């Protein structure tokens, strides 16, 4: 009587493990890049949410300001107007934000720095939103101090 084989041979198991290893080696870097891009896009979205408040303040002739932390002390009193974000954001991705009036009336530059819990490849990157007096917004993302920065992390709608 012939014996029926039960289970797998050692070579079959080794081939399966090799295939899993190859797939993991390809998938892990792609997943890390996906996480980095989604975090940059989320931080951009958090910053872009203040654009309407900034435009409203500029339209009313006020100076848009970020709510200062207790140590900074810049008051959001007329002619300043708070635009809904702190200079030390409570976001777990943005570690710092600055809102600076430009040289011309109505110009403003809003810069956010990725830090805190951002992926290590984007930690220290900056997102800059700039508004001109005509109300036109531009966006730029720079590596800053991020060591693993890739241009594919820039969100759509941002140059």
UniProtKB/Swiss-Prot annotation:
Positions of the pro-segment in this chain: 1-7
Intrachain disulfide bonds: 139-158
GO process annotations (BP): cell adhesion
Bilayer topology term: Single-pass membrane protein
Annotated compartments: Fimbrium; Membrane
Broad class of where this protein is predominantly found: other
Source organism of the structure: Eikenella corrodens
Recorded family membership: Belongs to the N-Me-Phe pilin family.
Modification N-methylphenylalanine, positions: 8
Pfam family membership, one: N_methyl
Entry's transmembrane regions: 8-30
Name of the protein this chain belongs to: Fimbrial protein EcpA
Keywords: Disulfide bond, Fimbrium, Membrane, Methylation, Transmembrane, Transmembrane helix
GO cellular component: membrane; pilus
């Amino acid at each position: 009587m012939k014996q029926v084989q039960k289970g797998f041979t050692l070579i079959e198991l080794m081939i399966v493990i090799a295939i899993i290893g190859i797939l993991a080696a390809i998938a892990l870097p792609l997943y890390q890049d996906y996480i980095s891009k989604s975090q940059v896009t989320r931080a951009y979205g958090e910053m872009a949410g203040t654009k309407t408040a900034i435009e409203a303040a500029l339209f009313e002739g006020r100076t848009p300001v970020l709510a200062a932390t207790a140590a900074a002390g810049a008051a959001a009193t007329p002619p300043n107007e708070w635009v809904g974000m702190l200079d030390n954001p409570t976001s777990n991705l943005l570690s710092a934000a600055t809102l600076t009036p430009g040289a011309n009336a109505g110009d403003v530059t809003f810069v956010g720095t990725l830090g805190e819990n951002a992926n290590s490849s984007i930690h220290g990157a900056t997102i800059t939103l700039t508004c001109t007096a005509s109300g036109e917004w531009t966006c730029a993302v720079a590596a800053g101090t991020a060591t693993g920065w890739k241009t594919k992390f820039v969100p759509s709608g941002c140059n």
